[in-house]
A protein has these predicted regions:
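Generic structural signal for well-ordered, non-membrane alpha-helical segments
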Residues: 7-8, 26, 49, 74, ...
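General beta-strand structural signal in soluble alpha/beta enzymes
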Residues: 26-27, 44, 67-69, 92-96, ...
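Rossmann-fold NAD(P)-binding glycine/threonine-rich loop
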Residues: 52-62, 71-111
Length: 179
């Protein structure tokens, strides 16, 4: 409702897991979304490589612009998905996949247009940074710092992507691909 009222965006469908409760916009069938001629943009907020990669690919092939926050699917399939988007003349937007609330991807694209990027430095994972800070400054052990990060909402209930380095690896692949 906020998107419709404040931005003029009409939400047409919400894809849900099979068997989950739903409302009037809910569908279990992705084909219903990409075959709707009123849908111009598909927004992907799934986690993991599949089925997100397939959905992004199918949406682009169906002539829909795509916005995704899914760094795993994008990092694993960057060239393929960007290639389809370029071939179809469609935007594939992924600012939300890296940098949280800062416009990292857009600024990286701008910098790459005017200069050769030879290195990048920064904090790529807030959860890991929080844990390391707690361990360094307060002498906490890893598990204690992780539990605090989870209690504060900085770490997911399943922090595997953060503490296993997968989140950083995906952001690094995307950033390097853009640069």
């Amino acid at each position: 409702q906020l998107a419709e009222r404040d931005c003029g965006i009409e939400l047409r469908h919400i894809l849900r897991r099979p068997g989950k409760a739903g409302g009037p916009l809910m569908t279990e069938h992705f084909a219903e979304i990409i075959n709707d001629p009123e849908v111009d943009v598909v927004v992907d907020v799934l986690a993991g490589i599949e089925p997100s990669r397939t959905y992004i690919r199918e949406a682009l092939l169906a002539g829909k612009a795509v916005v995704t926050a899914n760094k795993a699917a994008l990092a694993a399939n960057y060239e393929e998905l960007l290639g389809i988007a370029h071939a179809k003349g469609l935007p594939l937007l992924f600012e939300a996949s890296c940098g949280g609330g800062i416009p990292w991807i857009e600024n990286l694209k701008k910098a790459a247009r005017i200069d050769r990027i030879e290195s990048m430095h920064g904090i790529l994972n807030g959860t890991g940074n929080f844990i390391l800070d707690r361990m360094d400054r307060f002498g906490m052990d890893f598990d204690e710092a992780l539990k605090e990060a989870q209690a504060l909402g900085y770490a997911e209930a399943d922090p595997t992507a953060d503490i296993g380095g997968f989140d950083v690896a995906n952001k690094a692949v995307i950033s390097a691909s853009v640069a």
